[in-house]
């Protein structure tokens, strides 16, 4: 009896010590802040040397940590890309969450679910997961967390910019946090998503704009790109205010900071396209626990890698469903854990309501090393959407639809001036049907203007990339690669306008 009592006392003391250590560790668990802009391509940060975009706060995060120069989003469209980030799975692995404007079934585990279950306070401001209907998926809140969108600006700084006061909402979230409670927060800016102000700019300002090679170098293009840059700056300003809040709270050094974008710029042949400017996004990460500053990583990384990184940084076990590689070792100085030859993947299904019977334009992409391979398994469909739709029972005028391109000054110029010899080249780049397979050296041709799929000198390499992408799609259960692509067409569109189009044989 005496021995039992001593052992019990010893066990109790040891247990108390363990609980004390556990509580101390719990108080030191890292916070997580993810800042994600809406439709923002990789070249357009001042850290990348852009002459017309200013992002001092994104740059500061990179300077205090890492800049990943070849980061790829999960999709060239909002909701599937965000779903890939949240679930740690490629968009083709997550059913209706992998298409645009559908649902997000509760049985797909997100890192937010894991963090909340482990005691993290979770929230978001601005745009979380969407567009789509998360209630239809059986969820009780947006997959990005608890919504904080009550605080509004008295006046938006510019037409087209949201009145949501992102920084004030983050302040409210922090004020509600219990002392010592670890937190995760998703700052989802609505910028630089269209629509824009379409106002004039001084000539000297427009002269700074760098027009990509897939857009016409016109005043309309320059005006729109300058509007785009000002909206990126708004995103960056609120990021800066959030960093100030973290510093004032003494939490900056204990917070994993991730700054990125959901997909590329909202221009023709970028957003909603499997080319580099549709999926290649900015990425800056700060992790003070690693002690590394100002590191530039050239190896391609994907959104599924970020998902695994968040989970491991929080001290949790990465679920088997999360297929990415955690970059935590990289953030702690082991850069070599990312192999130079590792592939990253992206893809898309339906974007907007743009075709007969709401059909999609599926694409799958793989970036490895210097090359990007693109598979478009329905090459007879128009990549930007059907040229004409049906309004009040009548066909709209020729070339008046193409709804997979967001409405903008550039789009209207392409459509109305398509007969112009100069403008017409860019019109056809944006809307013409494309080959089933394309292959680009994105190191030399980041605008994806020179398809190497038919080049004899690249035939062996192209076959290798094509085979690797196909094998990956089959092994991860992509319905398109398994010959059951109709699955994607059957997912309902639950958010966004529904339009009507002529049958394929009459659509041109």
Task: Label every PLM stretch briefly.
Residues 2, 9, 14-19, 23-438, ...:
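Formylglycine-dependent sulfatase
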Residues 482-495:
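Short, charged, surface-exposed hinge/linker loops at domain edges
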Residues 443:
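C-terminal helical cap and adjacent loop that interface with cofactors, partners, or active-site loops
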């Amino acid at each position: 009896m005496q021995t039992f009592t001593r052992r019990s006392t010893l066990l109790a003391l040891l247990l108390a010590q363990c609980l004390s250590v556990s509580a101390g560790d719990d108080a030191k668990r890292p916070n997580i802040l993810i800042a994600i802009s809406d439709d923002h391509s990789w070249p357009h940060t001042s850290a990348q040397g852009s002459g017309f975009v200013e992002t001092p706060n994104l740059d500061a995060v990179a300077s205090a940590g890492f800049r990943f120069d070849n980061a790829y989003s999960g999709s060239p469209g909002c909701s599937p890309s965000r779903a890939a980030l949240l679930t740690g799975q490629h968009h083709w692995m997550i059913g209706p969450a992998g298409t645009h404007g559908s649902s997000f079934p509760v049985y797909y585990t997100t890192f937010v679910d894991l963090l909340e279950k482990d005691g993290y306070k979770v929230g978001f401001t601005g745009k979380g997961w969407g567009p789509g209907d998360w209630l239809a998926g059986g969820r009780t809140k947006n997959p990005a967390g608890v919504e904080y969108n009550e605080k509004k600006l008295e006046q938006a700084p510019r037409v087209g910019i949201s009145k949501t006061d992102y920084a004030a909402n983050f302040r409210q979230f922090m004020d509600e946090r219990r002392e010592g409670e670890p937190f995760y927060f998703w700052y989802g800016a609505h910028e630089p998503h269209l629509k824009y102000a379409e106002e004039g700019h001084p000539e000297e300002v427009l002269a700074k704009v760098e027009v990509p090679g897939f857009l016409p170098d016109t005043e309309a293009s320059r005006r729109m790109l300058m509007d785009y840059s000002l909206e990126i700056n708004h995103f960056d300003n609120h990021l800066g205010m959030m960093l100030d809040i973290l510093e004032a709270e003494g939490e900056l050094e204990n917070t994993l900071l991730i700054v990125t974008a959901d997909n590329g710029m909202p221009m023709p042949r970028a957003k909603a396209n499997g080319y580099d400017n549709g999926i290649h996004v900015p990425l800056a990460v700060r992790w003070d626990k690693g002690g590394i500053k100002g590191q530039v990583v050239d190896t391609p990384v994907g959104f599924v890698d970020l998902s695994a990184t968040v989970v491991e940084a929080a001290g949790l076990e990465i679920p088997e469903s999360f297929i990415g590689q955690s970059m935590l070792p990289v953030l702690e100085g082991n850069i070599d854990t990312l192999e130079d030859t590792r592939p990253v993947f992206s893809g898309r299904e339906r974007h907007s309501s743009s075709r007969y019977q709401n059909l999609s334009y599926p694409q799958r992409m793989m970036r490895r090393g210097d090359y990007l391979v693109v598979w478009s398994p329905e090459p007879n469909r128009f990549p930007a959407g059907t040229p004409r739709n049906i309004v009040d029972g009548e066909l709209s005028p020729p070339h008046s639809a193409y709804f997979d391109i967001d409405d903008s000054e550039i789009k209207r110029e392409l459509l109305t001036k398509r007969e112009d010899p100069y403008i017409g080249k860019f019109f056809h780049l944006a809307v013409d049907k494309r080959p089933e397979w394309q292959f680009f050296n994105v190191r030399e041709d980041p605008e994806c203007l020179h398809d190497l799929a038919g080049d004899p000198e690249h035939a062996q390499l192209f076959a290798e990339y094509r085979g690797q992408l196909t094998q990956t799609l089959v092994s991860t259960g992509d319905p398109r690669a398994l010959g059951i692509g109709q699955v994607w067409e059957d997912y309902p569109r639950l958010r966004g306008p529904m339009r009507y189009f002529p049958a394929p044989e009459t659509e041109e």
